[in-house]
A protein has these predicted regions:
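A short glycine-rich, Lys/Arg-flanked "PGG" loop and its adjoining helix->strand segment in the class I
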Residues: 7-22
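Short conserved AdoMet
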Residues: 4, 18, 75
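C-terminal helical/coil "lid" or tail adjacent to the Rossmann-like core of SAM-dependent
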Residues: 79-140
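A short SAM/SAH-binding and catalytic strip from SAM-dependent methyltransferases
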Residues: 1-7
Length: 161
């Protein structure tokens, strides 16, 4: 997601793995997150996170590219799995997960002028999300993650340039 040359980095890292060793990566598919019914606070957060990633040059759809990245790195095509945590009801741990994700991105949000700490109010964000989403009966699927894994074979990997 944050690498200019992900296949080259994967090739380099895979060289540290002994033959038969497992190579595993997980990446985001931002476009697959959604909520029903819509929750204004959640939609605002989603837009801020999206805009922050765009300003930073992150590839927010990198999960779809993992198969080709493994192959370009000289590895066998990986097995893959797609999953997403789902948030529903007042006891979901996802409210805190969402708030802490936003907290971790807040310095970048401010740096790029996407949102200010005063707008985000991260210290009570989890509680505000819980109240708003529970009142609306919102069910939210976080952006999906695609996991990819393969075993390194003796003959794997291209020579580094």
């Amino acid at each position: 997601m944050y690498l200019r040359e992900p296949a080259a980095v994967l090739n380099h890292l895979a060289r540290q793995v002994r033959p038969g060793g497992l190579i595993v990566f997980q990446e985001l598919v931002f476009s697959m997150g959604r909520s029903e019914p819509s929750c204004p606070l959640l939609e605002k957060l989603r837009a801020w996170v999206h805009d922050t990633f765009m300003h930073a040059g992150a590839d927010i759809e990198m999960g779809w590219k993992l198969f080709a990245t493994f192959q370009r790195a000289g590895l066998p095509g990986p097995e893959m799995f797609l999953g997403s945590p789902v948030c529903a009801g007042p006891d979901s741990p996802m409210y805190r997960y969402i708030a802490e994700t936003v907290r971790s991105l807040l310095p970048m949000m401010e740096y790029y002028g996407v949102a200010s700490a005063e707008e985000v109010m991260v210290d009570n964000l989890a509680d505000r999300l819980r109240i708003e989403m529970t009142a609306a009966g919102t069910v939210c699927a976080a952006p999906c993650l695609i996991g990819a894994w393969t075993r390194k074979l003796d003959s794997d990997l291209f020579q580094e340039a």
